[in-house]
Amino acid sequence: MSEENLRPAYDDQVNEDVYKRGAQSKLTKARKADFDDEKDKKKDNDKHIDKRPKSGPRLDENGNPLPKEPRLPKRKVAVMVGYCGTGYHGMQYNPPNPTIESALFKAFVEAGAISKDNSNDLKKNGFMRAARTDKGVHAGGNLISLKMIIEDPDIKQKINEKLPEGIRVWDIERVNKAFDCRKMCSSRWYEYLLPTYSLIGPKPGSILYRDIEESKTELPGVLDEDLESKEFWEEFKKDANEKFSTEEIEAILAYVPPARDEFDINEELYQKVKKYKQLENAHRRRYRISAAKLAKFRASTSQYLGAHNFHNFTLGKDFKEPSAIRFMKDIKVSDPFVIGDAQTEWISIKIHGQSFMLHQIRKMVSMATLITRCGCPVERISQAYGQQKINIPKAPALGLLLEAPVFEGYNKRLEQFGYKAIDFSKYQDEVDKFKMKHIYDKIYKEEVDENVFNAFFSYIDSFNKVTGAQGEETADKSGPAVQKSIFEFLTAKGIPGLTDAPESNKKIKQRKRMEEEEAASKKAEISSTTQSNEPEVQPEAAAN
């Protein structure tokens, strides 16, 4: 068909306004779409705008800009540090509060490792930490990465001279530009210090003691008979009966402190209560754990090894959340050691895990301690990995410290690029001396002065599970979503219907399969590396 046949028969049949309106409509829609795109882009950009005040040039006392210093080359480095967290508001830079990072940054500037032109902005130096510690928490080893001037061979010594005694730099190592100490940290070692008297069974007459003894009568043979704890409390009772009359002991045990405005420190009964508690504390500090009880505690902590669902060992995690599954690589419980003027016996618990959730370590220590002191079967810990919610109390924060981050996987890449591996074990002697002087001694002293662990476990033993902390009667509810009390969990009866965590949990199986694949891959990598490092035999040499 020709073009002439396609044209309309009459010119008046063509309405030019229609074409104009159509073109205008298309143009309007296109402009509106472009405008909407610009609005969306602006919204996205607003989300990423750094609204914090920007740092300007350095000024002198009169407000005039200071001259810039000559620029020296900066290198990406990993700085290995240790610190006592007492008196600091955590690790992370948080002005105007004193933090570990603010003290380190100030020392870097004063030592010349960071130019004064960059002394008012951490971001200019790419400051990053491997593990963030909270207020008052210590670290024998932690790591920060940043860009630093390291031309001076004595830079480490100069930085340490500018730092307070409670913060030390162990070493400074060059790393490649892509190094991110937080993301490339493959695992972490934590340490928890626990006085052994924490493993003594509940005090006779306490609520938890009565619940345990009643459950033993109903279901004999489930819980251990803790003869060691019975002997301890009998010795204390005998000593107390020699120093106080029966009437005085009854009055002491029934004593309720008055309101603060009515409190009288010189009151005769209060003074007797004070002496009674001092006598009990003296017996606790003289306590020495038996080999059998220490073995029970070690068996309890070993239940955490491997991949498990730790949703009950943190806050705000549901059983079905994949992030609740964590992998514990190793747990070591030391032999008991006596330290300090009070001659208290302690044990050290070291936990090596890929990653940890909020309060996880404190709840793990608390659960293992309660299982041991109440005589429960150690296998009961595996029930806490199941769907049922259980309220596990947190052990005191006092004993917790970061031992060191581990960069096992990334160290291989560093060595390939010609850099030294990040390894805290090279400085173990220095770290141990520092921990003993600036961390352990402070923990021991605070425990003696405040009786932190005694207060915690005394509260657990006397806690009323019916009225709770608010004095309101709790409703009797059932179902896995309803949080159950730890006190039901610790008796011979346990929580009705609660069984070991199901082995068929998909996420746990997937994680275990991943662990096996990772181990096989590492083995193959080591094997191939060994073979590649063997000198090749040249044909000439072979012929000779």
Swiss-Prot record:
Cofactor(s) demanded: Zn(2+)
Cofactor binding, per record: Binds 1 zinc ion per subunit.
Biased composition (Basic and acidic residues): 1-10, 31-61, 513-525
Gene Ontology annotations for the cellular component aspect, listed alphabetically: nucleoplasm; nucleus
Enzyme class, spelled out: isomerase
Enzyme Commission number(s) of this protein: 5.4.99.-
InterPro entries: PsdUridine_synth_cat_dom_sf, PsdUridine_synth_TruA, PsdUridine_synth_TruA_a/b_dom, PsdUridine_synth_TruA_C, PUS1/PUS2-like, TruA/RsuA/RluB/E/F_N
Catalytic activity: a uridine in tRNA = a pseudouridine in tRNA; uridine in snRNA = pseudouridine in snRNA; a uridine in mRNA = a pseudouridine in mRNA
BP GO terms, sorted: mRNA processing; mRNA pseudouridine synthesis; snRNA pseudouridine synthesis; tRNA modification; tRNA pseudouridine synthesis
A molecular-function term among this protein's GO annotations: mRNA binding
Active site per the UniProt annotation: 134
Subcellular location: Nucleus
Function, as annotated: Formation of pseudouridine at positions 27 and 28 in the anticodon stem and loop of transfer RNAs; at positions 34 and 36 of intron-containing precursor tRNA(Ile) and at position 35 in the intron-containing tRNA(Tyr). Catalyzes pseudouridylation at position 44 in U2 snRNA. Also catalyzes pseudouridylation of mRNAs.
Protein family membership: Belongs to the tRNA pseudouridine synthase TruA family.
Other comments on record: Present with 8130 molecules/cell in log phase SD medium.
Protein name: tRNA pseudouridine synthase 1
Species whose genome carries this gene: Saccharomyces cerevisiae (strain ATCC 204508 / S288c)
Encoding gene per record: PUS1
